[in-house]
């Protein structure tokens, strides 16, 4: 028993340390040395771009002027066709392969020149003919594919929240609110997809009933938080908080999701909360009305009426006091 408690404390300390040192800790295994220090300029570039975006690396073992001209042009046209802006844009970099480096696995890389795609803590090697534009474009398109759920009404989102009871469905709820945009949300969505998690984009502003659904069925979510990034699994949810760094999210997904052994593997309860049962019609009506009253009380007109009424009461009190002070209360 003591040994089990000791192991639990070690894991907990690791996770806390991991959370408090995000930028330096969440470096992919194929980058840098054991202490996380990059060994080359290319490694530094990969790490920097993967922190919030993604990139394709052209690797040549000798001069390849034509490929260095063609590949960035093809990639630029692909990005323009998709209408991508940073950080969703797939960026480009070049590396001459002269000696062994951590980000090139010779067991995966069959030929040179070659292309390697980086996103989160994942890399994918092309191993095709980089001279054939159609093949390169098809490869990029397959990596770029994003299957996104966008619930439009209360019932759509309600079904998603209830769909993890079979211990196989996994979802990541994301939002990109106008008042606090999250530019990397699509990168995070693709990372989740690579882990077998269905990304879900929640539209804003939320209607009253959908707002009630989110914060009543997941009561530990902070309504004051501007961002939304919530992992759903096994009738439970885990809130990533406001910092949606792709490298952090990728590492946290692998940390939070257990190795699937059996139908319903145990979750690390410290970071998970149970999703509350579906709301009854009466609860929907009550909580929606409660929210409407709360929102109305925040409006300037209601605040002004309350303030004016308060000042009027104070003035009336002073008038009565001075009136009494000058008449019956003054016996002299």
From Swiss-Prot:
Alphabetical UniProt keywords: Glycoprotein, Ion transport, Membrane, Potassium, Potassium transport, Signal, Transmembrane, Transmembrane helix, Transport
Organism: Caenorhabditis elegans
Gene Ontology molecular-function annotations: potassium channel regulator activity
Misc. remarks from the entry: Gain of function uncoordinated rubber band response is phenocopied by exposure to the unc-49 agonist muscimol.
Subunit organization: May form a complex with sup-9 and unc-93 where sup-10 and unc-93 act as regulatory subunits of the two pore potassium channel sup-9. Sup-10 may regulate sup-9 via sup-18.
Cytoplasmic side, ranges: 323-332
Protein name as annotated: Putative potassium channel regulatory protein sup-10
Function: May contribute to coordination of muscle contraction as regulatory subunit of a nonessential potassium channel complex.
Positions annotated as glycosylated: 61, 107, 166
UniProt membrane topology term: Single-pass type I membrane protein
Ranges in the topological domain labelled Extracellular: 19-301
TM helices/strands, residue ranges: 302-322
Subcellular location(s) of the protein: Membrane
Gene Ontology biological process terms, A to Z: potassium ion transport; regulation of muscle contraction; regulation of potassium ion transport
Tissue: Low levels in body-wall muscles, eight vulval muscles, intestinal muscles and anal depressor muscle.
Signal sequence region: 1-18
One cellular component (GO) term of this entry: striated muscle dense body
Top-level taxon in the UniProt lineage: Eukaryota
């Amino acid at each position: 028993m003591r040994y089990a408690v000791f192991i639990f404390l070690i894991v907990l300390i690791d996770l806390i340390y991991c959370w408090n040192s995000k930028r330096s800790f969440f470096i992919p295994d194929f980058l840098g040395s054991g202490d996380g220090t990059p060994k080359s300029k290319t490694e530094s570039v990969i790490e920097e771009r993967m922190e919030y975006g993604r990139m394709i690396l052209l690797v040549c073992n000798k001069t390849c002027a034509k490929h260095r001209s063609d590949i960035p042009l093809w990639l630029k046209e692909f990005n323009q066709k998709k209408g991508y802006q940073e950080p969703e844009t797939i960026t480009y970099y070049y590396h001459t392969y002269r000696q062994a480096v951590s980000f090139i696995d010779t067991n995966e890389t069959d030929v040179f020149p070659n292309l390697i795609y980086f996103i989160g803590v994942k890399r994918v090697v092309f191993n095709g003919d980089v001279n054939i534009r159609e093949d390169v474009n098809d490869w990029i398109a397959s990596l770029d594919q994003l299957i996104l759920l966008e619930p439009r009404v209360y019932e759509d989102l309600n079904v998603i929240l209830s769909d993890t009871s079979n211990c196989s469905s996994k979802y990541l709820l994301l939002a990109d609110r106008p008042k606090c945009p999250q530019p990397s949300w699509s990168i995070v969505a693709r990372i989740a997809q690579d882990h077998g998690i269905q990304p879900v984009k929640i539209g804003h502003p939320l209607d009253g009933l959908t707002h009630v659904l989110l914060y009543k069925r997941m009561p530990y979510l902070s309504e004051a938080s501007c961002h939304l990034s919530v992992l759903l699994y096994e009738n439970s949810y885990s809130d990533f908080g406001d910092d949606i760094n792709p490298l952090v999210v990728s590492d946290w997904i692998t940390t939070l999701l257990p190795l699937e052994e059996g139908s319903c593997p145990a979750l690390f309860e410290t970071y998970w909360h149970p999703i509350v049962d579906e709301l009854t019609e009466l609860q929907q009506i009550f909580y929606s009305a409660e929210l409407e009253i709360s929102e109305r009380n925040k409006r300037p007109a209601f605040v002004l009426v309350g303030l004016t009424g308060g000042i009027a009461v104070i003035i009336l009190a002073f008038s009565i006091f001075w009136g009494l002070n000058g008449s019956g209360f003054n016996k002299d």
